[in-house]
From Swiss-Prot:
Organism: Zygosaccharomyces rouxii (strain ATCC 2623 / CBS 732 / NBRC 1130 / NCYC 568 / NRRL Y-229)
Record keyword Nucleus present: yes
Described function: Acts as a component of the outer kinetochore KNL1 complex that facilitates microtubule-kinetochore interactions and the spindle assembly checkpoint. Kinetochores, consisting of a centromere-associated inner segment and a microtubule-contacting outer segment, play a crucial role in chromosome segregation by mediating the physical connection between centromeric DNA and spindle microtubules.
Swiss-Prot/TrEMBL GO biological process terms: homologous chromosome orientation in meiotic metaphase I; regulation of meiosis I spindle assembly checkpoint
Gene: KRE28
Subcellular locations according to the entry: Nucleus; Chromosome, Centromere, Kinetochore
UniProt protein name: Outer kinetochore KNL1 complex subunit KRE28
Top-level taxon of origin: Eukaryota
Length: 370
């Protein structure tokens, strides 16, 4: 499988190299054609400059590179103006020479002399008109040929430019396609590596030694949790025993001390007030208050014992939920975290207690239905 990918990679690299080579060759040929055209234009202008002083190249061409330079057109306007003036002067001179020629021709005695008395003569005007028509016709013919040639050159240049653009676009599209193939090949290689890694991981997971080690780690973690729960249970049992001793001493003292008896009755009335006014939900029992530690606890029969610590008069500081078993109380961590996340920090103690009791009663009912 890897050899197949290597073969594809070699072919893609080969195609990329060929594409780059042909693209560079095409660009080089295009550049050479442009330079050849510029060289030909420059040579034509040089030849014109040698034959006509109106077209000149300043300075001498000392090297081959300088002979390929494009003519500086900055002085063309001045040359054009001079050329126009010279053409007008040539026209006037031509007319003068033609007039003189006609004058000499027709004033000298001859058997075929034309009777032309002046430039305003009808015969002279007619001949001049014919000459201008012939001249204009010849000029128009040459102009049409020049325009047709220019149009052909323009069309050929456009076709050549379009062909060059098409070649460049083809090379560009080919390069993009090869880059996409290369990216897909890399992605395929990555996916195969991930698949191989996943298969190796599955093999490792099926290894009995690794599984045994993971089970051992899980057992150690469970033992640690059990030890923590046993310590928590021991602390709660010590608290219950201390509370029972306190109640026992309170009863003994209350029999002898009227003040203690009065406080005990007030505490019982306070518990009854909480049971009737602040905890209206049925199904709770064994409400106990601990004013000094700001704690109180109650049972949601027959499964849960709840211990709540108040931060102030309106806020829960801590909530602990324990499950009852035959001998001790065991903290239900999952349920405890759920209730903490939902009600810890609530600003309404009454609604918070109401919701906690509802939640625990639903758990009791769900367990009973199962």
């Amino acid at each position: 499988m890897k050899s197949d990918l290597d073969g594809y990679e070699v072919r893609i690299k080969s195609l990329e190299n060929q594409t780059a080579h042909y693209s560079e060759q095409a660009l080089l040929e295009q550049e050479q054609r442009v330079l050849a055209s510029l060289r030909e234009i420059t040579q034509n202008v040089i030849a014109m400059g040698q034959e006509n002083s109106l077209v000149e190249i300043k300075g001498e061409l000392e090297s081959k590179e300088e002979s390929e330079l494009v003519i500086d057109p900055s002085g063309f306007q001045e040359k054009i103006d001079t050329f126009v003036e010279l053409v007008e002067l040539l026209k006037v001179t031509h007319l003068e020479q033609e007039t003189l020629d006609n004058f000499l021709r027709y004033t000298i005695s001859s058997s075929n002399l034309l009777q032309i008395n002046s430039v305003q003569d009808a015969k002279y005007v007619e001949l001049e008109s014919q000459v201008k028509e012939l001249e204009q016709g010849t000029l128009e013919s040459h102009k049409r040929e020049i325009e047709a040639t220019k149009g052909q050159i323009k069309n050929l240049c456009q076709e050549l430019s379009m062909a060059q653009d098409s070649i460049n676009e083809t090379f560009l599209d080919t390069s993009n396609a090869l880059e996409e193939c290369d990216a897909l090949l890399n992605e395929l290689t990555q996916l195969r590596m991930e698949k191989q890694t996943s298969e190796e991981a599955d093999t490792i997971e099926d290894d009995p030694v690794s599984q045994t080690y993971e089970d051992w780690e899980s057992l150690q973690k469970s033992k640690l949790e059990l030890r923590l729960l046993e310590e928590e249970t021991s602390r709660l049992q010590s608290r219950v025993e201390s509370y029972e001793d306190y109640q026992k001493r309170s009863r003994q003292l209350s029999n002898n001390d009227p003040r203690m008896l009065q406080n005990h009755k007030a505490l019982e009335l306070l518990v009854e007030l909480w049971m009737t006014k602040f905890l209206p939900q049925p199904g709770i029992s064994h409400l106990e208050l601990f004013p000094q530690s700001r704690k109180f606890q109650f049972d949601v029969e027959p499964t849960f014992t709840v211990v709540i610590t108040l931060a102030d008069q309106t806020t829960f500081q801590n909530v602990q939920v324990y499950r009852k078993d035959a001998k001790s109380l065991v903290m239900d961590h999952g349920l405890n975290d759920e209730i903490k996340n939902s009600y810890l920090g609530t600003n309404n103690i009454y609604n918070g207690l109401n919701d906690i009791i509802h939640t625990l009663q639903r758990r009791v009912q769900a367990k009973g239905s199962n």
